[in-house]
């Protein structure tokens, strides 16, 4: 499939560096892909982006702050057991170096740099929460919203299992082999036996993510931002 494609670039947006990539023609309808917790823009597979672009969209994917080749920030530590218990049973969020609203502003600032007034927003998991923040705070910038495997933050909604929370929030490994093994394990859990598995594809995705650069401390900060977020309904 042949579509217009601009290689990754870095923009100064909201005071930080945001690495982004564009598929599709300049005059096409803009569509922004926002990845989830600790995820990188390349987890929106190239073929997926090309297919959307071939349908008449200008696809913008990017690394959130603290992931991939975007700016690495500072502050925040691994959540303590006490902090986790307060979140789980008292709905008291931990302190966070930045919020999902800050990450929403990153997205809007990137669109400003690109000269895009409004776009379709597509977010997965934490990315869906960011997309919701954009729709609430900057409604005039949103043509449509697609929220994938995400939440509004309402504590009355069904919650993830303790096992899922434990696996997804455990410290990110620094070694390549352990990172790949954890990546494959987590995606197997997220599929929950409902979607076909492709071990070779999962491995290639994990290798690409690791080789672009992982940031365990950044994942911890993103976890705090997610837990800090109040319900938007």
Place the predicted regions along the sequence by residue.
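A domain-start/cap signature at the N-terminus of enzymes
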Residues: 1-11
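Conserved acidic catalytic loop of the alpha/beta-hydrolase fold
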Residues: 88-97, 101-119
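Short beta-strand immediately N-terminal to the catalytic nucleophile in serine-hydrolase-like folds
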Residues: 103, 121-123, 148
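Alpha/beta-hydrolase
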Residues: 160-231
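Residue in the alpha/beta-hydrolase core beta-strand immediately N-terminal to the catalytic nucleophile
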Residues: 63, 120, 144-146
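Flexible "cap/lid" loop of the alpha/beta hydrolase fold
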Residues: 132, 136, 143-174
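Gly/Ala-rich beta-loop-alpha elbow adjacent to hydrolase catalytic centers
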Residues: 123, 127, 131
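Conserved HGGG/HGGXW glycine-rich cap/lid loop of the alpha/beta-hydrolase fold
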Residues: 12-90
């Amino acid at each position: 499939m042949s579509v217009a494609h601009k290689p990754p670039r870095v923009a100064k947006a909201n005071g930080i560096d945001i690495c982004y990539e564009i598929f599709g023609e300049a005059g096409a309808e803009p569509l922004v892909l926002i990845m989830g917790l600790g995820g990188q823009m390349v987890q929106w597979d190239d073929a997926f982006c090309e297919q959307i672009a071939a349908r008449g969209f200008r696809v913008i994917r990017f690394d959130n702050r603290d992931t991939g080749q975007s700016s690495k920030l500072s502050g925040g530590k691994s959540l303590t057991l006490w902090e986790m218990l307060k979140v789980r049973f008292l709905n008291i969020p931990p302190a966070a170096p930045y919020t999902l609203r800050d990450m929403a502003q990153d997205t809007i600032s990137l669109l400003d740099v690109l000269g895009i007034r409004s776009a379709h927003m597509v977010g997965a998991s934490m990315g869906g929460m960011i997309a919701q923040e954009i729709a609430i705070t900057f409604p005039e910038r949103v043509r449509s919203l697609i929220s994938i495997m995400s939440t509004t933050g309402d504590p009355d909604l069904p919650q993830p299992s303790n096992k899922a929370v434990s696996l997804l929030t455990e410290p990110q490994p620094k070694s390549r082999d352990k990172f790949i093994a954890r990546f494959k394990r987590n995606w197997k859990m997220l599929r929950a036996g409902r979607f076909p598995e492709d071990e070779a594809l999962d491995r290639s995705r994990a290798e690409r993510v690791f080789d672009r650069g992982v940031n365990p401390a950044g994942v911890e900060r993103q976890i705090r931002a997610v837990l800090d977020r109040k319900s938007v309904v």
